[in-house]
UniProtKB/Swiss-Prot annotation:
Organism name: Synechococcus sp. (strain JA-2-3B'a(2-13)) (Cyanobacteria bacterium Yellowstone B-Prime)
Reaction catalysed by this enzyme: reduced [plastocyanin] + hnu + oxidized [2Fe-2S]-[ferredoxin] = oxidized [plastocyanin] + reduced [2Fe-2S]-[ferredoxin]
Binding site for chlorophyll a': 680
Pfam families xrefs: PsaA_PsaB
Lineage: Bacteria, Bacillati, Cyanobacteriota, Cyanophyceae, Synechococcales
Any GO BP: photosynthesis
Listed name of the protein: Photosystem I P700 chlorophyll a apoprotein A1
Domain of life: Bacteria
The keyword Cell membrane appears for this protein: no
Gene3D superfamilies noted in UniProt: Photosystem I PsaA/PsaB
Amino acid sequence: MTTTPKEREPKVKVSVDVDPVPTSFEKWAKPGHFDRSLSRGPKTTTWIWNLHALAHDFDSHTSDLEDVSRKIFSAHFGHLAVVFVWLSGMYYHGAQFSNYSAWLADPINIKPSAQVVWPIFGQEILNGDVGGGFEGIRITSGLFHLWRAAGITNEFQLLCTAIGGLVMAGLCLFAGWFHYHKRAPKLEWFQNVESMLNHHLAGLLGLGSLAWAGHQIHVAIPINKMLDAGVPADQVPLPHEFILKPALMKEMFPSVDWGIFSGVVPFFTLDWGKYAEFLTFKGGLDPQNGALWLTDQAHHHLAIAVLFIVAGHMYRTNWGIGHSIKEILEAHKGPFTGEGHKGLYEVLTTSWHAQLAINLAMVGSLSIIVAQHMYAMNPYPYMGIDYATQISLFTHHMWIGGFFVVGGAAHGAIYMVRDYDPAVNRNNVLDRVLRHRDAIISHLNWVCLFLGFHAFGFYVHNDTMQALGRPQDMFSDTGIQLQPIFAQWIQSLHTSAIASTAPYVGASVSPIFGGDVVAVGGKVSMMPMVLGTADFMVHHIHAMTIHITVLILLKGVLFARSSRLIPDKGKLGFRFPCDGPGRGGTCQVSGWDHVFLGLFWMYNCISIVIFHFSWKMQSDIWGTVNADGTIEHITGGNFAASAININGWLRDFLWAQSVQVINSYGSALSAYGLLFLGAHFVWAFSLMFLFSGRGYWQELIESIVWAHNKLKVAPAIQPRALSIIQGRAVGVAHYLLGGIVTTWAFFLARFGALG
């Protein structure tokens, strides 16, 4: 009997190269080994600057996209290793030097501390009393609150987690080496976007959320339930006991049969009501600890897991079913968009700068959204009454978001200069935006002027009227009202429409929109925020600073390759000081210079946001609840009357609230006083770089070198003044560092002193 021979199975696709790059410590030990001119060693002091500028600029090391991709991939593992080491350090501090157990027993009266300053020559002033007889530095990272929410009940668990972090760091370092030197992915692996989406959506986000939901259900919820009921932390069963002893869970949530298989039967038989005790839909905040209900969070993570696991199965990989990203993009055309998104698939799979630009813009925006949500819908127990932590987390997420958004514009401009291919982008959305960039930028400029003159004009008007003694003619809640009616409408909608828009939810997402005061231990955790004329005015300042930042950054991207002034700008590269000595008026036009200028406006923008937040919360939200139910706010509700003119901002915010940092000497907060002054100095120091010319310094250096030659101590490496770009980079770095540290010291001394 003969059989038809089966077709030969297609060979398994090999998507890695074996041993592509030898491991050479000898090579790595040579500074600048990645660049031919740098590897020759330093002749002038410019060498060290170029070394830093090019070390991670993989495009300058090689033009091979596959090698660049591998370097980025390997660097990601290195980055993760650094993150794990850093996190491990945080957990180790919690395990070894903190008052976590004491805080867990009394989170209302004891402040978190996880660092004790060792005495130098008997110096003991920096360790303050944080309650419970513990002397240390107060921390404001929110980690204690996160640890409690996760179900960590003692320092030994933190120590184990810290060790786990170091193990993960080691694995990541190994993976970074292994995937560059031993088994390096081919370019096609990096460009296989459907498989990547499946992996990231279903694997990382889907299974990650499912794992976290499982942790919350089996560990965090029962432990927090016991802690909330007053069970001492050392008497709460250990995490694994809740998993291995179903009787413990049955006692708390009797409607489910907590067996390994029987526990999930209701999920697959759609009998979901059985889970209603711990997968809830309460809405709002838990009145006992002022945080989002942990049972709502578990419900959320389970739902998110299901959504992402489904989403991870939408894309076409080995089985010929599902979506193709290229097809989706090429089909995406509107009536006014020409070829639509055609070509963007090629852009995003051949330019990692383009990919990174989008990711940075989105993650930066997400960080800013996180800042807004974390205070209004506090996720962790007792964090809402730790005002120092609330202001720190808000400020942190705003700054991070601002830097990421600017980074998005930076890499967008680098893409335009290094990777943009006109042949790929023919009449698609990107090409069409570039062709009407003049209309976009001129309109955006008009918006900035309109917002700037009007928003600033409100304040100038109010200062003038107040100076002339005419309060009735001021824009205010008691004079000429400018009420934010749309914001107030959204607030009332969120408060009143719950029954019709989300019929199963018990309460609005946050009391900030309206409703009752959530007070914990006599302190306001969250309450309705009343918006008025002062908010309307400062929101238009926010609008102005956001639009100006966008104007600068978008202009940098859209004009990175060419402009009327310099038609061949793309040939000059991403960063250049001016277009040569023959052409005047061509300085500060490079893509890099737009990022440089954009950073200053980002700083302006975020500063005003965090100032507004800090004062508004102290004035209208944060405070103590008296026995008769009245609320005593930290600054007594002075925002509405004082924030409507410039004088009020200077007098009642900057000056009045810097009392604590200025008077901090001789107290446990004295380090903030030193930082406040030191950071002012760093900020002022930046101006020396920003307002000086390169030639001035070169002349000075040559004079100093002459003196060294006279004394026969001339250096072998020739000193050079910083280039124009280097000077600007040093200047903006110190400007931002000085400004941010000044603000940090100002806020923390203030809130540390308030307790």
